[in-house]
């Protein structure tokens, strides 16, 4: 689905289903440098099980026109604009990494629009290392390698992919190589600079990978302490890329959390 926001095209994957009034809505928000396809497996399930689905391409990513938005708050406001444009009063937000910060900020500042949030591979604060930021700033391909290697558990390149025919490293690199120069750096800086404003009152689910070296489970401890009550799922086998590394466990956690 393409919509027009501020004279720019924005794309949302809807699992090949038209949006229907009366159905609950779930919005999937990708991480830094990625696009809607990060949530391909999970979003498709909900689209075929009674939900309106919007798996978004943020501005400057995938099929949405740029430039990228420079702050998490601006991205959260943009997500709410999408809801406005589509006459969706309230939605569940599911975010991965940077997307989890967007969901978090939207829930804090636009509480009346957010029913629940699921935070996949979240850390707070989400400080990005200077070598990673610097490589992205220089549009150095080393930044893509850091994103890809740190973004998956160490066993991923050894095989055993739960999705037959999918090469996780290659898939990640292909998405990053499609980016315009500066987009990855903009995303990383926005994530690193983010400070939560306000409190979150809606139900919250944390889905964390035990083998995640980018946002290890302990890095969500401060945030979990600020949000009570919340639910927690830790996937022992997964690194940062939970949706691809552990698609079934991630989906099971979401299904249980979104059960109506």
Model-assigned labels for residue ranges:
Residues 29-31, 208:
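The conserved beta1-alpha1 loop
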Residues 181-225, 234:
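Conserved serine/cysteine hydrolase catalytic core
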Residues 31-34, 97:
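Active-site glycine-rich loops that stabilize anionic/oxyanionic intermediates
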Residues 6-11, 15, 40-48, 52-98, ...:
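Active-site loop/oxyanion-hole signature of alpha/beta-hydrolase fold enzymes
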Residues 101-145:
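Flexible "cap/lid" loop of the alpha/beta hydrolase fold
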Residues 1-26, 48-51, 88-89, 178, ...:
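Alpha/beta-hydrolase fold catalytic core
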Residues 238-251:
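Catalytic histidine-centered segment of alpha/beta-hydrolase-like enzymes
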Residues 134-199:
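Conserved alpha/beta-hydrolase catalytic His-Asp/Glu region
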């Amino acid at each position: 689905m393409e919509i027009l926001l501020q004279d720019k095209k924005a794309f949302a994957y809807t699992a090949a289903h038209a949006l229907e009034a009366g159905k609950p809505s779930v919005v999937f928000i990708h991480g830094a440098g990625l696009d809607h396809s990060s949530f391909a497996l999970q979003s498709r399930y909900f689209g075929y099980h009674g939900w309106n689905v919007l798996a978004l391409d943020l501005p400057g990513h995938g099929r949405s026109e740029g430039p990228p938005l420079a702050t998490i708050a601006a991205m959260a406001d943009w997500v709410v604009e999408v809801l406005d444009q589509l006459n969706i009063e309230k939605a569940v937000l599911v975010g991965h990494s940077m997307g989890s910060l967007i969901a978090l900020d939207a829930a804090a500042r636009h509480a009346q629009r957010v029913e629940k949030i699921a935070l996949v591979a979240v850390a707070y604060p989400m400080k990005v290392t200077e070598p990673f930021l610097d490589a992205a700033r220089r549009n150095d391909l080393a930044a893509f390698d850091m994103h890809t290697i740190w973004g998956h558990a160490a066993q991923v390149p050894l095989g055993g992919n739960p999705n037959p025919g999918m090469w996780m490293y290659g898939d990640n690199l292909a998405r990053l190589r499609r980016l315009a120069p500066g987009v990855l750096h903009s995303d990383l800086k926005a994530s690193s600079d983010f400070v939560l404003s306000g409190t979150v009152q809606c139900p919250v689910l944390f889905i964390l990978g035990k083998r995640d070296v980018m946002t290890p489970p302990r890095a969500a401890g401060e945030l979990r302490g600020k949000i009570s009550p919340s639910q927690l799922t830790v996937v022992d086998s997964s690194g940062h890329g939970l949706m691809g590394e552990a698609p079934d466990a991630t989906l099971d956690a979401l299904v249980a959390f979104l059960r109506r």
